[in-house]
Design a protein with these regions (language model features):
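Conserved RNA-binding domains used in RNP assembly and mRNA/RNA metabolism
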Residues: 2-99
């Protein structure tokens, strides 16, 4: 699987942590991520929290792909929560209008 710039991926790190982020660049063994968040347990189940609290939010974070055990495109429901967590925009459910 090739990592595509502009897509949102979930990365499982060698530490066991899961990171979700929109890919902004891919260079050799480095993937740049916009607004990376970590998956963490909370009172209502799994949630998304900021991965790096002291980093400049205007800059992409760089992830060494050698520290990744597995990755995949992010599930659409998690991607909607990622967009909500990073932008404040709520993605509406897709519904068909019936006649």
């Amino acid at each position: 699987m090739t990592i595509t710039v502009g897509e949102t991926y979930t990365f499982k790190l060698t530490s066991g942590e899961e990171v979700v982020g929109k890919v902004t660049a891919v260079e050799d063994h480095i993937v740049s991520l916009h607004d990376p968040v970590s998956v963490a347990p909370g009172p209502q189940g799994m949630g998304l929290i900021q991965s790096m609290f002291t980093a400049d939010p205007k800059e992409s974070a760089r992830l060494n792909i050698n520290n990744v055990t597995i990755f995949a495109l992010t599930d659409s429901s998690v991607k909607a929560k990622y967009i909500e967590a990073t932008t404040g925009l709520v993605v509406p459910d897709k519904k068909l209008i019936l006649g």
